[in-house]
């Protein structure tokens, strides 16, 4: 907008020490009733007036970030909550910024593929020691809902010398990361710890989290090792049996050699009903649709367990017709472009199962087999399958 460019020019003017021009343009914006309290406060600071006190800025813009840096003011704690990927990357790499804010930004930036996971790993190792005695790894009530708490938990897992404490810490860490939508970034930097932690029967309590993390980090072989432990311990161990059923759908999607099991599907379906009955059918339909899109045969009785009104596989949706056409004609670039659009936008409110089926099928048809499977896994994790 015109106001944005005026603000940008004014900031450049004050940086070039043309303060009178910047002050005049800022006053004109105020007189026109433009609403941007953070900008005006920061501009006043840069012009040498009152020092800004900004305690919250959840929708920070690149201009506001640059102004905060120029004014040598700290970023508010919530600055990384809704920022764009490029800005998240900048915040994560801003050495003068509070570590807690950088950690939050780094997690989100890695999740958006805008930052090397190794940078997140280095940030996780900063900031002192780990949990206090009241919040030790594996303790009840450890939530790790902030990036700083997850970093501390990661350090506890890394420094644990025994396998059970390390598994307990990683279990807490992966659960917290999944709740906060950052499982893939956390899993990627935790894979070295996972490889050192060899699967064993006495660690079966950790198997579901290990499988989910390994699948998220595109490590199906590691996931398969932990899944086998859960299956092996399932007879006579209700916790292991429940864990095996919980992550079996992810193994079906991530590892093509995983066998279909009517019993595991039925148990998983019952778990979904217990967990969130309102979304159970949506998740189950999406799982089955993704399987079929990956050319895995789904028994008819599996669909019959779902309510008759559940949207099923591949139903014709006008909005996805162009995607299918591009894939069938092997227009690979167009297929990827239309896939990106279909992933982000759903103006026709297409049922999730049909949309995912169309996207994965199109990717496979256009010759992107590996990418189709990765997309299916990411979609399943995102849906909470």
List each language-model region with its residue ranges:
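Alpha-helical solenoid repeat scaffolds
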Residues: 1-385
């Amino acid at each position: 907008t015109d106001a944005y460019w005026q603000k940008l020019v004014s900031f450049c003017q004050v940086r070039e020490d043309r303060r009178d021009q910047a002050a005049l343009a800022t006053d004109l914006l105020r007189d026109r009733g433009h609403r941007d309290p953070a900008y005006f406060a920061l501009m006043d600071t840069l012009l040498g007036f009152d020092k800004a006190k900004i305690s919250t800025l959840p929708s920070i813009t690149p201009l506001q970030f640059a102004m905060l840096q120029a004014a040598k003011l700290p970023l508010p704690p919530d600055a990384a909550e809704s920022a764009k990927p490029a800005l998240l990357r900048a915040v994560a790499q801003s050495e003068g910024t509070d570590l807690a804010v950088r950690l939050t930004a780094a997690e989100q930036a890695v999740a958006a593929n805008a930052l090397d996971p190794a940078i997140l790993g280095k940030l996780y190792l900063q900031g002192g020691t780990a949990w206090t005695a009241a919040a030790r790894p594996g303790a009840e009530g450890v939530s790790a809902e902030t990036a700083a708490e997850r970093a501390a938990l990661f350090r506890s897992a890394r420094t644990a010398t025994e396998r059970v404490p390390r598994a307990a810490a990683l279990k807490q860490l992966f659960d917290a990361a999944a709740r906060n939508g950052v499982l893939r970034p956390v899993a990627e930097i935790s894979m070295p710890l996972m490889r050192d932690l060899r699967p064993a029967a006495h660690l079966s309590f950790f198997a579901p989290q290990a499988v989910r993390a390994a699948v998220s980090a595109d490590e199906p072989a590691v996931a398969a090792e932990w899944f086998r432990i859960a299956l092996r311990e399932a007879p006579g161990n209700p916790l292991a049996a429940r864990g095996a059923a919980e992550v079996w759908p992810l193994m079906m999607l991530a590892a093509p050699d995983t066998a279909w099991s009517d019993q595991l599907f039925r148990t998983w379906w019952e778990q979904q009903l217990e967990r969130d009955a309102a979304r159970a059918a949506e998740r189950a339909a999406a799982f089955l649709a993704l399987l079929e899109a990956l050319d895995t045969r789904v028994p008819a009785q599996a669909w019959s367990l779902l309510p008759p009104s559940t949207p099923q596989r591949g139903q014709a949706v006008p909005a996805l017709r162009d995607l299918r056409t591009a894939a069938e004609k092997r227009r690979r670039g167009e297929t990827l472009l239309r896939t990106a659009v279909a992933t982000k936008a759903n103006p026709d409110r297409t049922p999730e199962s049909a949309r995912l089926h169309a996207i994965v099928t199109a990717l496979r048809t256009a010759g992107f087999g590996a990418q189709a499977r990765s997309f299916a896994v990411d979609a399943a994790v995102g849906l909470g399958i």
